[in-house]
Amino acid sequence: LIKSSFGYWQIYTSDRNLTANKRDYMDICIINTGGTISCIGEPLAPMSAAEFATASQTILNPIVAETFPDTTLFYETALTFPESSTGTLDSTNLQPSDWCLMAQYILDNYATYDGFVILHGTDSMDFTSSALPFLLNVFDAQGFGTAVLSKPVIVTGSQVPMFYKAPTPPSGPKPALTLNFNTDAYQNFCGSVAAARLGIPEVGVYFDSKLYRGDRVLKINASEFRAFDSPNYPALAEYGIEMTQYGDLMLPGPVGADVSLDNATALAAAKTQLTAITAAIDSNPVMQLPAFPAPYSVPNATAVIADLITACAGQGIKGLVLESYGEGNFPSGNPDHPAGDPTATPPIPAGAIYTALEAANTAGTIIVDSTQVIAGTVNNSAYASGAWLPNVGALSASDMTPMASLTKTMILLSAATANGWTADQVKTLIQLNLFGEIMNVSRLDSRTNATLLPGQSIMALDGSAKLINDPSSGPIMTASDGTFLWAPFGSAAAGKPGRLVMQNDGNLVLYNASHTALWATNMGDADGGSSVLMITGSTGATNLTLSVYNYSAKSVSATLYPQS
C-alpha cells in the first residue's frame, strides 16, 4: 500500500500488467480473540468482545483519529470461540480449530476491509501467528502460491491490560473504564493500526514498537514489555518517532492479480482449502518433544524418551517436532552405535530412541528435527549425536521455530488430501520456504533471495548435491561425494568468479565485480518473469535436477542439469 498526495493506492504487479485501485481511506477490522489486553478487574477477567469494542470506541478511537483521520476502525464481535462462555478465550486454551475460526473470519470478510488487527493473548500468540499464513494462503505441490494474501493481518496483545476499572463503591454510579496506567496495550494497539496501514501482504506480530514476521516470532519474556522477538529474521518495521520500514525484508505478495485474494476466484480457492483443513485438523495432531536428560540403557535397549515416543505414536500423533539440543542433536539411546551393529559379536542393539523414531517413521509419522535454542540453524550433520536422525526419516527444520514447525506440519497434513499431495510432497513442502518461515535452502528466488554471493550455496533438501558459488571458480554443483555435476562453463576449471543472480525477468546471470555479464541462460522476458533457480530431487533417487522455473508463467524455462 503506497501513500501519495492523492490517498492510498493498492498496487498489484505482475509480469504482464499493472493495475491500481485508488483509495482515499482505510477500513481496518479489529478482531478481539481475548487475552490480557482485554481483561479488567482484580483478579483479571476477560471482557466480552462487545464490551471491549464499546470501551475502545469511546477511549481509543478519538486518539487514533487524530493521527490517522483517513482510517476507520471496525470492531467485529461476531467471532466467538464455542469453548468459552464470554466468546473470547485466554490463549492458553486455544486449540488448532480456533486458528481456523480466525482464518475463516478473515476470509469471509476479506473484501470488506483493507487490513486486519487481531488482539490475542501472549501465551500462544507465536503459534497463532505461525499458523495463519498457512491457513490464509494456497500453494501448489512445488510451494508456489496460487491464492495469496494481499492485505495485512497484524497480531498483537499486551503484558498489561488496556483498561482499568476502579472498584465499585457501595452506592452511587459505577465507575467508568479508563486507560490503564503504564500499559503496553495502548502502544501495541496504536502500533498495530499503524502497521496495518502499511499494507504489508503478510501476517505480522506487532509488539513493543517492532513489527515482526508472524511465523518467525518467539515469546522470550513473561514479565517485560519486550515479550516477543524474531531471533532468526530481522524486524520488518520499527516505530519510534515515526514508522521505519525495511521493505527488502517484507514478503513481495501475490505475483499477479490472478493469484491475489482480491481476486474472487483465488479467494474462493482459499475458502475451499480452509474448509478442508478445518474438517481434518483435529485428525492430524502434531506434538513437540524436547530433548532432555533422561535414563536409558544400552544393553537393555530401553529409554524413557523412547517410551514417550512410542506412547505418542500409539495415540495417533501424525507429526513429531523434536526440540533437539544445539544444532539438532537428539539422544539416540546408544551413543556409540545409534543404529546398533548386528554383525558385531555379540550383536549391538540399536538405541531405544533410534528404534522408537524409526518405528514412528515407518508408521507414517512425520518427524521434524528442530532446536530448543532460540536462534541459529539446525545442522544435524555437524555432530555424530545428530547425524543419525536422517536415517530415521527426520527432516531438518533449518532455522524455523518449533512453533512454525508444528503449525506448518499440522496444516500441510490437514490440507494434503484436498490438494492431492502425497506424503513425500508434504515432506518436501515442510522444508521449502512458503511464506518466509524458513530460509531458502534449495532455491534462489528472484523476488526474495535473488543473489548467490561468492562462498554461498544452495543444496538439495537431502544434502545429496550442492551448488556453491566458489570464490575462485564461480558456480559449481557437485554431489555430496564430490562428483562434479554442473558449472556454467562446462567444467570447474573453466569457471570464473562472480555473483549469480536470479533476475526478475527470468534470466539467470553470472556477473563479475564490474557487473559485466559473464554467462546467462538468456531466457529472460522483457515484460518480466518472476522465477526461481531450484535444486529438486536427489542423487540417490537419480532424479536430481537444477532448473529455472518461471512461476509467473508456471513453466520451466531452463534445465541446467541433467543436460540433454
How should these model regions be labeled?
Residues 25-440:
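Active-site histidine-anchored catalytic micro-motif
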Residues 440-564:
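Beta-rich ligand-binding surfaces for carbohydrates and other polyanions
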Residues 6:
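Beta-rich carbohydrate-recognition modules and glycan-binding surfaces
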Residues 21-23, 146, 279, 468, ...:
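Generic structural signal for beta-strand residues in well-ordered domains
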